């Protein structure tokens, strides 16, 4: 009975993700020179990521990526995939600006902060601003890791899930045309598909069980 209630609450939580997170200490992007920026990224290299994250032996470590609209539209979707359970969340962002990306991060953290210990992302401009780094590490106290350039396989879980999302919203789809609710309904369908890697359980079921055990 408790599991059923939690599943319903989780579905409601996902469907009702707001377009902005709860208010946090306001941060501003600080200008950094290219060399300093390079060092900020290199010191957070995926090669420094602990083995317990690499081998998926612990819960709460997420891969994130951007799923883009056409070039004439700034809106895009940031996807979050928990590595151990393959559970996926998507949040719309108005643009790739540091402020709009931070708003999307705040939205995600407003629901999943307690089950997020680290984030691994690529080196796209939306994820390498000083505001993004300070938001993840200073505001929320999470570890941040960057994959190597041109290495999508280092975030293979996220890439595979994004391909499934693209079957619903093909390349070139303009995400300004959908609501956050419609996006999450599509992602919920993905989360309810049994996975061989999860012994034919669904990401939603495995994720929910982990939350209950926390």
Question: Where would I find each of the regions flagged by the language model?
Answer:
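RNase H-like two-metal-ion nuclease catalytic core shared by retroviral integrases
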Residues: 121-123, 129-135, 144-168, 177-187
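Short, structured coil segments at secondary-structure junctions
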Residues: 139-140
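Short conserved beta-strand segments at catalytic cores or DNA/RNA-binding microdomains
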Residues: 67-89
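C-terminal domain-tail junction helix/linker
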Residues: 133, 171-214
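Active-site beta-loop-alpha junctions of metal-dependent nucleic acid enzymes
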Residues: 70-73, 90-112
